[in-house]
């Protein structure tokens, strides 16, 4: 698996993968430990893993919040793996 620098479109690709292959529970899709959900109009989407949350905003803007660097590293590896599968 090749690690790549992730861009907004990569996170949107992962969001689509999770929402299509995952299962829905309490308004969130779940797949391989990652949750994905969106607001009522779909303009804002979120991905979460442990203490990390990615906010995907309209026009390709994105926000990343996490408490532990290890969580970010784990998430980065998971995302790269999911992108490689799709």
Predicted regions and their residues:
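Negatively charged, low-complexity tracts enriched in Asp/Glu with abundant Ser/Thr
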Residues: 1-38
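Residue-level signal for functionally critical sites in structured catalytic/ligand-binding pockets
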Residues: 10, 24, 44, 48-50, ...
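Intrinsically disordered, low-complexity regulatory segments enriched in Ser/Thr/Pro
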Residues: 49-74
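Mixed-charge, Lys/Arg-enriched low-complexity segments
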Residues: 70-86
